[in-house]
């Protein structure tokens, strides 16, 4: 697809029938870290206007931990995982109660969906989330999504919901992604640094960010930084979805296509939901290392990974789990869904189809990763 102009990207966003909006904890809280009802009400009002004009809106909202640590008597966000999870369990209900009141003023119902990273790994769970979101939107509800911080493992970090928002945009076939943060745009360097300039338009987020300095650290009440927001914009861009990044007070103008924040152009036409899931949603559980011949065939775009071209297998995974396909150098070539359990694959390595049938049985005469379940990276 040809690269659209900045004006064209902003028109795409303004014309979007389905919009996913992500807001971080720092955009919903007071300087003390407590939830700020006025900020939440202002955001709900901006989203309600889109919904009342016939648009479909999904909100990916952080803030459960930020909403909970004040009522529990903490002065600041807890740092240990167990206390964070307990705080999120208290805060999520408080957060949703505020949203229900705020949207209720406009006669709009909201529905809560809590997701863990595990829900993006198994295709069945992924499809269940997809169906639930579709039905909520059909019913005129504004789904409010958050990572299930009270159950999530691995230090409760999905990227402050940034990557999750891009995956949700794929799930609901959104035509725009809006990332709301505590700065008004992307800058060439930290905004406080002399000479820093606002970046109004990024035509190709994959190629054009080498000269932009970003920080991986987030605020004291959140977990994400600009790095995770750029990753979300990248996922959206290669999924055919335009993105705008700005501060929460600019939510309304951003969705109307006004010249605020930073817009990121889509760099590919939209792919299938299944292939987008394989490529972005599912965290690989292991790695299959391939020889040069298999690597060349995979790079060609339409080849399955056969056991004859596989050299090594690493990790513990089951058939159907996502895996990396790597060259001997360690370069990631593709992601795919494994056709066999990891414990079955070592005996298959290097064998052609005839050998697999003869020595292991006909049930093993199949690709390690079928081409329909493989996405180049």
UniProtKB/Swiss-Prot annotation:
Q: EC number(s) of the enzyme?
A: 2.7.2.11
The record's InterPro entries line, in alphabetical order, gives: AceGlu_kinase-like_sf (IPR036393), Asp/Glu/Uridylate_kinase (IPR001048), G5K_ProB (IPR041739), Glu/AcGlu_kinase (IPR001057), Glu_5kinase (IPR011529), Glu_5kinase/COase_Synthase (IPR005715), Glutamate_5-kinase_CS (IPR019797), PUA (IPR002478)
Q: In which pathway does it act?
A: Amino-acid biosynthesis; L-proline biosynthesis; L-glutamate 5-semialdehyde from L-glutamate: step 1/2
Keyword ATP-binding present in the record's keywords: the answer is: yes
Say where the protein is mainly found: cytoplasm
Q: Is Transmembrane one of the keywords?
A: no
Per UniProt, residues of the PUA domain are 285-363
| Entry's localization field | Cytoplasm
- Biological processes, Gene Ontology terms: L-proline biosynthetic process
Family of this protein: Belongs to the glutamate 5-kinase family.
Quote the NCBIfam families the UniProt record gives.
proB
The job of this chain, per UniProt, is described as: Catalyzes the transfer of a phosphate group to glutamate to form L-glutamate 5-phosphate.
Name under which the protein is recorded: Glutamate 5-kinase
Species this protein is from: Bifidobacterium longum (strain NCC 2705)
